[in-house]
Regions:
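Functionally constrained cores in energy, signaling, and assembly domains
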Residues: 56-59, 69, 85, 101-104, ...
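Glycine- and acidic-residue-biased ligand/ion/polar-headgroup-sensing regions
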Residues: 65, 75-94, 132
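Alpha-helical bundle regulatory/interaction domains
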Residues: 92-168
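Feature targets compositionally biased, intrinsically disordered low-complexity regions
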Residues: 32, 43-44, 88, 100, ...
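N-terminal low-complexity or simple alpha-helical regulatory segments
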Residues: 1-80
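Generic low-polarity alpha-helical segments
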Residues: 9-10, 56, 87-89, 139-140
Length: 168
C-alpha cells in the first residue's frame, strides 16, 4: 500500500488537473501499480503506473480526448523512454510530430514538457522512467567497469522508428 501512496503523491496533482482520478481497485494492467481513470466530457481511458522505490517507474497510457488538448508537465529529473503504438500530435520543445510506431526519449528536470494532442486518436504507449538514483548511483555501483552515462545515451536516442529491442 505504501507504493500506491508514493505513486499518488508523485502523480496525483497532475493527473487530477487533467481529470484523471485514482482507481486503485482497477486490475486492468495487473495487480501491482496504480491505475487512474479518465472519464469526463473531455475523453476517457486509463493511465497506469508501477514504481520500484526511487529507481524507476513503468507507465502505460491508454486514453483519448474528444478535443485537441494542450498538455504541460513539469517532470522531475529523470530519463524516460516510451514506445507509442498510437498517438497524434506535436511536441513543442523540441518541435516534432508525435506519430505511432516510434520510440521517444525525454530528459526530465529541465524545461516543462509541452505537447498538443489531437482529438479522437487514442494515446496508447508504454514507457520506463528512470530516476537519478538508478542511472547515476545504482548502475555505477553494480557495473563499475562497464558503466557508461545513460544521460548521454538518452540524448542520442531522441526519436526513432527503429528500435526492435523495445517493441518485440
Amino acid at each position: 500500500m505504501a507504493a500506491y501512496k508514493d505513486l499518488e503523491q508523485q502523480y496525483g496533482q497532475t493527473m487530477e488537473e487533467h481529470s484523471f482520478l485514482p482507481d486503485p481497485e482497477n486490475r486492468r494492467y495487473g495487480s501491482m501499480g496504480l491505475c487512474w481513470r479518465h472519464s469526463s466530457r473531455q475523453g476517457g481511458g486509463f493511465f497506469w503506473t508501477y514504481g520500484q522505490q526511487d529507481l524507476y517507474t513503468i507507465k502505460i497510457h491508454d486514453f483519448f480526448f474528444h478535443e485537441d488538448q494542450l498538455l504541460e508537465f513539469h517532470w522531475p529529473e529523470s530519463l524516460s523512454v516510451t514506445w507509442y503504438e498510437s498517438i497524434s500530435g506535436e511536441e513543442f520543445s523540441p518541435c516534432r510530430r508525435l506519430v505511432p510506431g516510434c520510440v521517444k526519449s525525454f530528459i526530465g528536470g529541465r524545461e516543462p514538457y509541452r505537447a498538443l494532442i489531437h482529438r479522437h486518436i487514442p494515446i496508447v504507449s508504454i514507457g520506463v522512467e528512470i530516476t537519478p538514483a538508478y542511472y547515476r548511483d545504482y548502475l555505477r555501483r553494480q557495473f563499475p567497469e562497464e558503466y557508461q552515462s545513460l544521460l548521454e545515451s538518452f540524448q542520442t536516442l531522441d526519436q526513432t522508428e527503429h528500435f526492435p529491442e523495445m517493441v518485440q
